[in-house]
């Protein structure tokens, strides 16, 4: 019996708990958190079946919005849009590369920060100037890349231990 959904639920809840406890990167009135929940979604989108990726993106977005104080659906929309893009590109991306999850984490972090800023500005009367977003983004982009690589490595290991995935053959056989 595969434990896909229980393992995903555990990873999402653990990521939510850790993301809540970690400090924010402040830039004036703006604060960005370490993107642990989007990193879990990126793992499922890049490495697992499509239904698991969609489910992970949806719930990572719901939890991100609930913990971050942005209008419900904002991060879910952003993560689902990113998931569809990465699903379309997945057949062209190398499987065993660490660069792909790192780049995806950085791209998704920037996309979500810009989307959340736009929604807060349009729907909630948030009036912080756009340039205040640059300093936190300069910090969060490399941090998101590293966090995503770490989360993907941990998620691969957990799924392997749970019997959800098979070991990779990353070295060509003679």
Enumerate the language-model features and the residues they cover.
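Terminal, non-globular segments
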Residues: 1-174
């Amino acid at each position: 019996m595969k434990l896909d959904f229980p393992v995903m639920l555990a990873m999402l809840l653990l990521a939510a708990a850790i993301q809540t406890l970690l400090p924010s990167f402040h830039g004036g009135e703006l604060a960005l958190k370490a993107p642990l929940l989007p990193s879990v979604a990126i793992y499922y989108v890049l490495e697992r079946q499509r239904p698991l990726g969609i489910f992970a993106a949806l719930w990572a977005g719901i939890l991100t919005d609930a913990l971050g104080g942005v209008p419900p659906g904002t991060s879910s929309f952003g993560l689902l849009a990113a998931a569809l893009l990465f699903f379309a590109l997945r057949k062209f991306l190398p499987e065993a590369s660490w660069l792909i999850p790192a780049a995806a984490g950085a791209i998704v972090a920037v996309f979500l920060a810009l989307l959340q800023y736009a929604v807060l500005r349009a729907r909630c009367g948030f009036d912080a100037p756009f340039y205040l977003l640059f300093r936190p983004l300069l910090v969060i982009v490399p941090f998101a890349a590293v966090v995503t690589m770490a989360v993907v490595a941990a998620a691969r290991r957990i799924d392997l231990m749970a019997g959800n995935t098979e070991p990779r053959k990353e070295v060509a056989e003679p």
